[in-house]
Amino acid sequence: KKRVCIAGLLAMGHEILLLDEPTAGLDPMGEYKMMNLLTRLNKENGVTIVMATHSVDLVPLFLDRLYILSKGQIVRGGTPEDVFTAPEDMSNVKLRLPQIAELIYKLKHEDKMPFERIPLTIGEARREIVKLYA
């Protein structure tokens, strides 16, 4: 249903889509497909996408820039790497890091594992772990 609504908006010639929780209520595969569709619309058709989402695990895979808002104010903004490397800003507004970033952050700070950076995706985490043990 959500894809049909988006198609209708695009058929009317909209160049900007404002979406509130476009992945809400979808299973993980549906969330991934929706975010992939929105990314393709942006990259291939030049459609500007502005969305509100709490799906932080998908953000690093699909978004170039994001802003964390609280009470109408921007708390932090930038690339996913810029935003998610400040977990204190996330917890202050009751958001969490992407799951893999949360795990690596805990390993780095609580278990003193020498990660150079906090990876945001499973692929990035794999590369960082291989670097540590290569």
Q: Whereabouts are the PLM-identified features?
A:
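ABC ATPase nucleotide-binding domains
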Residues: 90-134
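A short, proline-enriched helix->beta-strand linker immediately N-terminal to the Walker B motif
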Residues: 11-15
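Catalytic Walker B motif of ABC-type/P-loop ATPase nucleotide-binding domains
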Residues: 17-20
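H-loop/switch region of ABC-family ATPase nucleotide-binding domains
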Residues: 53-54
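Helix N-cap at the start of a conserved alpha-helix in ABC-type nucleotide-binding domains
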Residues: 28-30
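A short, surface-exposed alpha-helical micro-motif characterized by mixed small hydrophobic
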Residues: 59-61
